[in-house]
Amino acid sequence: MSQATFAKELTAKFAQLWTEKTKRPLPPVNQAMMQRLRQGQRQSGPNEVFSRVSALFRDLSLIPQSFENAELQDMAMEILPLDRLYSVAEERAEEEGERDNWGLQDYLIMELLRWFKQDYFTWVNSPPCETCGENGNVQFVRRENSTPEEQKYDASGTEVHQCSNCNTEIRFPRYNDLSKLMETRRGRCGEWAKCFAFFCRALGLRTRYIWNAEDHVWSEVYSERRKEWIHTDSCEEAWNSPTIYSQGWGKKMSYVVGFSGDGVTDVTRRYVRKADQQLPRTMVPDEQFKTILNSITSDIRQNLSPSEKEELKREDEAEERELASYNADEPQEAQMPRQSGSVEWTKARGEGGSDD
């Protein structure tokens, strides 16, 4: 029996614990929707800035659509340690579920976080020297355009590092292609977040890719048990710790936006709870910002049935009530400082802790 076939049987075993909404797969690649999103990139708005911001978010909205590729999902099923993930999740759900109010799928993602961080993906400050194998003596020297071969795997640029031992230059392409990420299994925030979010979706879970204007990305998954979106960050093995960035890292943020197969949502208030943690939101006026996100969401949901649209509208309204409920004066749990990345790198990004 292939791993992919085993995955389907194992998922079916727990199907009764998933809602029909969760089990309903999106089309492998919804070409009509992707065409609408791309057309929206070229539409004019109130001004040039509005158009550029709209194009940026329409481009980002294509990322979760790429998670629906059936061939890539089959590749993921061959990689994921499904028996182990489900066994641990089932055991924890039986032992801790009632007390902690988490469901099987929540424990599944908790275990996926642990496996992804500890056993699967590797963080790269500088890549090891390919000639002498040195790790500690390799330093970044420049960034340059990716080669045609690197561009085949959607490299967004290539870093060049140099070994001080042997002077060898090592290329570190910043790949975005999911098949390549499953091959290289390494990177920084972008590679980690995209590959982890894809694995969540490959397991059949509703997943968001979370973009932050201050150069960090992570993910959220929808908890069917709690009926809410839950923060996940594979770089930190973090579960349901949305204030980790503002409290633990000392990171100030302006925009935090979630992209899923169901729409686009401004989730800044989940992650920024206090005025002194909020950077100015100056991309476009807030009303225009809402218009951009609503337009993209409308395009994504265009072909859904009236009942599906109504269900998502109810979810949107419930999430809006949740986000509006956060009290800036309420005590916040202490959070860990950033674990991933070198000290110099995190400090340069303003993520070295609240005393940075």
Curated annotation (Swiss-Prot):
The gene coding this protein: PNG1
Annotated stretches, region: Disordered: 300-356
Cofactor binding annotation: Binds 1 zinc ion per subunit.
Catalytic activity from the UniProt record: Hydrolysis of an N(4)-(acetyl-beta-D-glucosaminyl)asparagine residue in which the glucosamine residue may be further glycosylated, to yield a (substituted) N-acetyl-beta-D-glucosaminylamine and a peptide containing an aspartate residue
GO CC terms, sorted: cytoplasm
GO molecular function: metal ion binding; peptide-N4-(N-acetyl-beta-glucosaminyl)asparagine amidase activity
InterPro entries in UniProt: Papain-like_cys_pep_sf, PNGase, Transglutaminase-like
Localization per Swiss-Prot or TrEMBL: Cytoplasm
Family as reported in the entry's similarity comment: Belongs to the transglutaminase-like superfamily. PNGase family.
Binding site for Zn(2+): C129, C132, C163, C166
The protein's required cofactors: Zn(2+)
Gene3D superfamilies according to UniProt: 2.20.25.10, 3.10.620.30
Broad class of where this protein is predominantly found: cytoplasm
Positions of substrate binding: E236
Name used for this protein in its record: Peptide-N(4)-(N-acetyl-beta-glucosaminyl)asparagine amidase
Basic and acidic residues compositional bias, start-end: 307-316, 346-356
Keywords in alphabetical order: Cytoplasm, Hydrolase, Metal-binding, Zinc
EC number from the UniProt entry: 3.5.1.52
Active site: C189, H216, D233
Enzyme category, top tier: hydrolase
Primary role: Specifically deglycosylates the denatured form of N-linked glycoproteins in the cytoplasm and assists their proteasome-mediated degradation. Cleaves the beta-aspartyl-glucosamine (GlcNAc) of the glycan and the amide side chain of Asn, converting Asn to Asp. Prefers proteins containing high-mannose over those bearing complex type oligosaccharides. Can recognize misfolded proteins in the endoplasmic reticulum that are exported to the cytosol to be destroyed and deglycosylate them, while it has no activity toward native proteins.
